[in-house]
Amino acid sequence: MGVEISLDPPVCPIQANGGVSKHKMINHTDRHMAYKVKSSNNSNYSVNLIYGILKVCDVKELVITRKPGKPQADKLIIQYCMVVDENTDPKPLFANGVPPGELSGETVIKLSAAE
C-alpha cells in the first residue's frame, strides 16, 4: 500500500486566532475511493467535505477552517477504501472505522496552529 489519497499542500498552517486553509485532496489510484475526513479537535476545526467518493485520479478541494483557540497538536485523518461503484453511499462504509480491503487505509495531516 502506498499513498492512495494525499493532500496538497500536505501541511495546514492556520493561525491560532482562526482562519481557512485550502487543499487539493488527490486520488492517486486507478480505482474509485470512498473517504471520510475526521479531526482530532472538532471544537476548533471543521472541513467542507466529511464523506465522499474520489473518482479515478480525481481531485477535490478540501477547505479546513479553524476557530480561534489555544494551539495544540491536532490532526486530520482521511480514512479511505476502494469502491466499485462511484454512486456508493460512503457513510455506512465507515460506521466501524476503516473498512478492510485491498486498497484501504488512512492519511494523517498534522494541523499546526501558530500563535
From Swiss-Prot:
Signal peptide as annotated in the record: none
Residue ranges of coiled coil: none
SUPFAM superfamilies, A to Z: PapD-like
Alphabetical list of Gene3D superfamilies matching this protein: Immunoglobulins
Pfam families the record matches: Motile_Sperm (PF00635)
Protein's UniProt name: Uncharacterized protein ZK1307.4
InterPro entries noted in UniProt: Ig-like_fold (IPR013783), MSP_dom (IPR000535), PapD-like_sf (IPR008962), Sperm-specific_class_P (IPR051774)
Occurrences of domain MSP (ranges): 1-115
